[in-house]
Amino acid sequence: MTAWSLHELWKTSHSTLFQVTLATVLMAPVLGDCGPPPSLPFASPISQLDEVSFPPGAVLKYTCHHGFKRTNSSHITCDENGSWVYTTFCARKRCKNPGELVNGKIEILSDLLVGLNIEFSCSEGYLLIGSATSRCEVQGKGVNWSDSLPECVIATCEPPPVINNGKHSGREEDLYTYGSMVIYSCDPSYTLFGNASIVCTVVNKTVGVWSPHPPACEKIVCHQPQIPKGELVPGFRHFHTYKDALEIRCKKGFALRGNSVIHCEANGEWFPSVPTCEPNGCIDIPDISYASWDGNRFPLENTAVFEIGTKLKYRCKPGYRANVHDVQIVTCQENLTWSSPSGCERVCCPTPNMEKIKIVSERRDFTGTCVYAYGDYVFYICSEGTYPMTTDGRSSCQADGKWDPAIPSCEADPSLQNHFALTFPNISETNVTNRTYLLENENATESFIKAVCPKPEIINGNLSVEKEIYAEMENITIQCDSGYDLVGSSNIICLENRTWYPDIPFCIMEGPEDCEIVNKGRQLLQCLSSPEDVQRALEVYKLSLEIERLEQQREKRTSVHRKAHYTKVDGPFRPFS
């Protein structure tokens, strides 16, 4: 090969050849050499090398790091491309099997090679005493585990908690091992809330605790619910305890609104809420003034419930009549209300013709719209100069709107111009002369006489007006002393026949203290020893009352027919013969 000087090369005319030659000269030392040897994770060169460039084919020997062992030829070679070529020739050493962990387990994450960890854990209910991990590491010329096997010991709990108003089934022990269970119970009349049993468990794999929390014993009372128109199953009890159940039923005519079964809850309340019994028909019988219910087998009650479509018939009380001619019926309608009744109106009696009669006394009910209504009565006399009446001077307004007896018309008497005679039918003159009369207005031009009545003798009572004699048509009121009851009318009037009407009442003691003062059979049952005696006594008493009533009627008929004519005189009174 001919050597060329650089000057000569520049002078050549072959520029292309020059460029190729120059590149070859410059690249010759780079393409064939290897750089410094690589730093391997498992091995390093046997000796320290100072060279930074190695020719192709150069071989370097390596030695394995601690914890690794040689598995193949431990050298690297520089190839023609200037790269170090090698295969993995060192492998990690392996620690021995750690063995078996009693009541636990060992978790090998990947292998037992150097640098790797294993983990320890205990079985449920056991606590780990020692390290939870161990690492395979180099120790001297070999490898071993960084930590020895731990120990798994069974967990323990303190004695179970004591609760108020209750107890548990555990024995008197200082410690309870994992899995131990105790059962709680409450004292009588107390209810257990929570879990009755608790168990010794482990928390965070470090400590033994009782789980769940112990229960509590409380006294829970639910009061007996009050459900109008409802019935309870089971029957009546003042109190109910937790979780007691009640079934509610409604009485006939009422429908249940709500749940039929309720339970006593921990807060002392019923759940669901207590239902109600609502009417399933019409209630509250219509209040029809002056009417009574008719055609019903049993007395009607406001508390009864009537089904839809029920018809009730009513009738007006004596002295009243229907406002209209409609049927006197009310009906229970679909909306659970009664149809509107037509009602009753008062029956009125006509006002007496006052032209020739004079009303001297009356009893009237001034609260109504009638001048005279059913039950009212009047006392009357004929005006002066007219015929005397043929009745007893008293008439009552009846339920049909008529007076009974009918009020007569008094006719003028032409024979009585300047006087009128005094006569008593069916009474002898001798008897007449023995009667007492009162001369009215003795000094007047026209004088009249009136019959007088003697003072009534009321034992244990008093009169509204105290006098020895009372004039005809004069009213008095009788009132009994304290502790006595009035038998008869409290108001009486003096009639022209010198008798009191109605009969003079009397006062009797309110209640007998013993059998000696029993009045007319009152408290008779206390005085007789057998029912037969009582029956006979009542029959005798009834018979005596009938006799007394007949005598009074006979006396009344006799007094009614005693009528008198009075003589107009100019001086002292004298009866005509």
From Swiss-Prot:
Classification via CDD domains: CCP
UniProt signal peptide: 1-32
Pfam families xref list: C4bp_oligo, Sushi
Sites carrying sugar chains: 72, 81, 144, 195, 204, 335, 426, 431, 434, 443, 462, 475, 497
Post-translational modification: Glycosylated.
Top-level taxon in the UniProt lineage: Eukaryota
Main location per the UniProt record: cytoplasm
Keywords attached to this entry: Cytoplasmic vesicle, Disulfide bond, Fertilization, Glycoprotein, Repeat, Signal, Sushi
Function: Binds to ZP3 glycoprotein in egg zona pellucida. Probably involved in interactions between sperm acrosome and egg zona pellucida during and immediately following the acrosome reaction.
Protein name: Zona pellucida sperm-binding protein 3 receptor
Organism: Rattus norvegicus
